[in-house]
Amino acid sequence: MNMIIRFSLSIFLLSFTGPLFSQREMIDTAVFQKIRTAELNSSEIPQIAYHLTDVSGSRLTNSPGFKRAGTWAVESMKKWGLKNAAFEPWGEYGRGWDIEEFGISLRAPYTGYIIGYPLPWSSNTNGEIHASVYEMADGQLTDSVWMEKHRQDISGKIILLTSAATKHEEDFKANSHRLTDSELVKIPDTYVYNHNQIAFILPMRQRLIDGKMKLKSFGALAVLDCRGTYSGGTVFVQNSTGFRANSPVLPPEATISTEDYFRIRRLLASGEPVEVALNIKGKFYSDDTKAYNVIAEIPGTDPVLKDQIVMLGGHLDSWNAATGATDNAAGASVMLEVVRLLDSLQLKPKRTIRIALWSGEEQGVYGSYNYVKNHFGNGETGVLKPEQSKVSVYFNLDDGCGKIRGIFCDGNTAVKPIFEQWLTPFRDLGAQTVTLKSSGSTDHVSFEWAGIPGFQFIQDPLDYESITHHTNMDTYDYLKLDDMKQSAIIVAAFVYQASIRPDLLPRKTLIHEIFPFEGL
């Protein structure tokens, strides 16, 4: 009901016969109204999201689920009328993985349930194992002297790694949140990292790998851990190793809920013997170790501008404990809806509109980074390819399913007043913030690195960080479909405006820096 009321108000704002800001940006209000009407009356977002989540399943890069989702997207875009819809290889990645059997339970001091999930690319237990649990800290895993001293304690055990996980304390804050006007005014840089920060963690990661290899050599049967501070059975599941063709074979590993983690620790601390049964049977897919993005286009119609490109996208890959609904089937669904909407309205963009659904984002934005290197050049060396100069902009969506409240300009002062004008017709939808602050850690960073304007939208967080992000709860039921429809309206308008304006969007100076996630 609220969306309908907001739409009615918007008609008043967009009812002018001429373009707004005629002395600056030429905004086609009639097209904006068509986009709104079509999306609110005939959105296909619910069906698109359903196919990417419930039907496709989890979407680890190179897994059957990713291929199901990508194939459906390619075939759907062909049916909608887009051109050149296809999987495009971007380079060497590694193995796919999918779970075939999994079970975990407490067997002593009594039989009971444990909420847990296998880490993606975990090795197999080769049937159910049943063993005592031995507790050790993350720091001890990297202490070779301590490890050697406790070799006999480790042998034949399931190891519980203790970490920074903290017990849930009720804080009486709502799990879901919309940004207030005061928060939008003060919005900070978000998820921004440089290469030095990323490089700092790489030796630490290698030490953990080495420690787990030593556990295996000492006879440890498996590893259990707990990642994060979630409660209510919500389990955070991700893994940074195991997918490369030459990855070492580590002990089987699963992640368990904070409640079960602390229960086991309390039992061990009191001297109770704790035994766990664990079965992990996964399947590795290594016939094709290249990875693929999904690409399609709406061809430009202007004889002069049709070779220039406006890009939009989001990553299609996810983690394995759920179906990756808010991260990032939501963003992928919105972007698919945008191109479906624009093509169905036969708007005839002057520039070519190209959508990209990326793979390998969760491991280090590999899909977009390699796509940019393959097509546009190297931002570190400054050796750029001819196509780089033809890309006006890339728009990204990857912060959950909340409605768009604005856009990060990533320090691009020249583009800020342009976006402010483009957003003005959508103030009634709650989108009005245009900030020079930056958002990082997702695929637009690849374009920025190569000197191409790349932007992430500001979205209401809802329960993205509190419940769904990289967890077993990231399912279709947490999607806010009306919010996603609002996002599709705004992204479609931005993409269309970029495709028809006389000039390419303004660029920042190329910095010539190492890609932030190089080496991951």
Which residues are covered by each model-predicted region?
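Second-shell loop/turn segments in exported
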Residues: 32-40, 54-64, 120, 124, ...
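Metal-dependent peptidase/peptidase-like ectodomains
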Residues: 111, 131, 156, 166-168, ...
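His/Asp/Glu-rich mid-to-C-terminal helical/loop segments that flank catalytic regions of hydrolases
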Residues: 245-248, 252-256, 263, 340, ...
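Short helix-loop-beta-strand segments that form the rim/entrance of peptidase-like active sites
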Residues: 47, 188, 341-366, 389, ...
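Soluble metallo-hydrolase cores and metallopeptidase-like ectodomains found primarily
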Residues: 30-31, 122-146, 151, 241-325, ...
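Noncatalytic luminal/extracellular "stalk/propeptide" segments of secretory-pathway proteins
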Residues: 24, 50, 54-190
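N-terminal capping segment at the start of a domain
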Residues: 27-63, 236-243, 317, 393-399, ...
